[in-house]
Amino acid sequence: MTKFVFVTGGVVSSLGKGIAAASLAAILESRGLKVTLLKLDPYINVDPGTMSPFQHGEVFVTEDGAETDLDLGHYERFVSAKMRKSNNFTTGQIYESVIRKERRGEYLGKTVQVIPHITNEIQAFIEKGAAASHDGKADVALVEIGGTVGDIESLPFLEAARQMSLRMGRNHCAFVHLTLVPFIASAGELKTKPTQHSVQKLREIGISPTALLCRADRPIPDDERAKISLFANIPQDAVISVWDADSIYKIPQMLNEQGLDRLICEELRLDPKPADLSMWQKLVNAQENPEHEITIGMVGKYVDLTESYKSLIEALRHAGMHTATRVNIEYIDSEELESGHLEVLAPLDAILVPGGFGKRGTEGKIRAIQYARENKIPYLGICLGMQLAVIEFARHLAGMADANSTEFNLETEHPVVALITEWVDREGKVEQRSADSDLGGTMRLGAQRVPVKEGTKARAIYGAEVNERHRHRYEVNNHYVPTLEKAGMVISARTPTENLPEMMELPESMHPWFVGVQFHPEFTSTPRDGHPLFKAYVEAALASQQRKGA
């Protein structure tokens, strides 16, 4: 039977519950246990797919095409299990499911209430999510409950966790509570009162934490831990100090050294082998002792909020670990490039345009792409970044000065990028598509296997086949591909059934390293294995740096 560890948060949000849960899961996995993770989001949105990145950060896409919380990206980077749609659910999904059941008469005319109907549904969703990995035989499922204790939105989830613990009995559920211990500079001391109140609030709900993770900007002294232990009624060895680290990959070792995994295993009556964190130590060592250093310019419109590009930033760091390179990222606001200021691109070793939606800032991105192409700076375009590379190429090298995407200009004379429902086929006819003819109707989501053309950079990077995840509404218009290819562009991967361009590149005679991909490779990069595309990109940046210095 799967055992559960519920991870809750108190005092303030954004303390790093996702990193803490993923780190504990990584330690338990290193002890030989089969682990999986779930994220419960208290907001009423059905999923984060239509939420602004400024509000919610990155939307992480799973292999089965679910648009989920960015914490699922952390989970996949820390453990071997692949996340699925059932690993993340929201209040919106719970209420939607309960209301559908009520309409179908499944409650036999009873008054539908938060307790028991909503809380029972939450428990059913938790058990379904835990069974999605390891053929339903996970040893431990870590369940992160979003929000903070005391939020009205979180109450049904906390109540469901309490009921689940009661129903399953002792030694089947553990609770880890993450809280803040702020340092007050004017007083010169750490303050434990917010943590005391947070634990009291949790105990009022009926939950007593097995362990307390105390976040601070510095290690918490033993006397403060003893004070927290006394007032929170938790053994002192269960009060874990979690201070700010310069790398999230140091957290598993930090928690292991203080015995968090031992406490959890004792509570759940598990007796696995000792933890082996040598892989994490090796990765941290590679990160802290690079032989090279490069600067990559990331040109986007969400550059003030790096949470919007969380997986991409981590993928570049992974590539750095596997190439002994410190990867510095320069965030460049694409709107500032629209009025000039291209000189900020000159010192860069490589340029990257990530995915995105909407017209704002696109002309600045196109100018950055043109600069990269003309100045032979390594370029990687992801999703929108590939589409804009096609537009830039069509305008300046293929004789289509008005080339654009119908996302930005419905009246463009040359729609080289078009909506999934309005492609022009090889005969010049508008081809209408539906949910039956394309994954997700107007949004292509999830993983897809695609063959790769021989003799291309893509083939050297990926081999014969690429299997990556998608999240987009627009595609390169096949009607214009022959013209683009005649001008020198190489379409190096196409979907097997629709024949849609998945990867584009420029030949070495035109540019040393210029690649665009319609998919999102950042979602499959892990610190353990890195990612072949990002590794090749960093190596191209190093080669460019050497050419500049020669």
From Swiss-Prot:
Reactions mediated catalytically: UTP + L-glutamine + ATP + H2O = CTP + L-glutamate + ADP + phosphate + 2 H(+); L-glutamine + H2O = L-glutamate + NH4(+); UTP + NH4(+) + ATP = CTP + ADP + phosphate + 2 H(+)
Keyword Magnesium: yes
Record entry for activity regulation: Allosterically activated by GTP, when glutamine is the substrate; GTP has no effect on the reaction when ammonia is the substrate. The allosteric effector GTP functions by stabilizing the protein conformation that binds the tetrahedral intermediate(s) formed during glutamine hydrolysis. Inhibited by the product CTP, via allosteric rather than competitive inhibition.
Record key words, sorted: ATP-binding, Glutamine amidotransferase, Ligase, Magnesium, Metal-binding, Nucleotide-binding, Pyrimidine biosynthesis
InterPro entries linked to this entry: Class_I_gatase-like (IPR029062), CTP_synthase (IPR004468), CTP_synthase_N (IPR017456), GATASE (IPR017926), GATase1_CTP_Synthase (IPR033828), P-loop_NTPase (IPR027417)
Residues binding ATP: S14, L15, G16, K17, G18, I19, D71
BP terms from Gene Ontology: 'de novo' CTP biosynthetic process; pyrimidine nucleobase biosynthetic process
Protein residues bound to L-glutamine: G356, L384, G385, M386, Q387, E407, R473
Keyword Metal-binding listed: yes
Active site location: C383 (nucleophile), H520, E522
EC numbers, comma separated: 6.3.4.2
GO molecular function: ATP binding; CTP synthase activity; glutaminase activity; identical protein binding; metal ion binding
Domain Glutamine amidotransferase type-1: 295-547
Pathway field: Pyrimidine metabolism; CTP biosynthesis via de novo pathway; CTP from UDP: step 2/2
Chain sites annotated for binding Mg(2+): D71, E144
Function: Catalyzes the ATP-dependent amination of UTP to CTP with either L-glutamine or ammonia as the source of nitrogen. Regulates intracellular CTP levels through interactions with the four ribonucleotide triphosphates.
Subunit structure: Homotetramer.
Miscellaneous comment text of the record: CTPSs have evolved a hybrid strategy for distinguishing between UTP and CTP. The overlapping regions of the product feedback inhibitory and substrate sites recognize a common feature in both compounds, the triphosphate moiety. To differentiate isosteric substrate and product pyrimidine rings, an additional pocket far from the expected kinase/ligase catalytic site, specifically recognizes the cytosine and ribose portions of the product inhibitor.
Family listed: Belongs to the CTP synthase family.
Designated name of the protein: CTP synthase
Organism: Cupriavidus taiwanensis (strain DSM 17343 / BCRC 17206 / CCUG 44338 / CIP 107171 / LMG 19424 / R1) (Ralstonia taiwanensis (strain LMG 19424))
Taxonomic placement: Bacteria, Pseudomonadati, Pseudomonadota, Betaproteobacteria, Burkholderiales
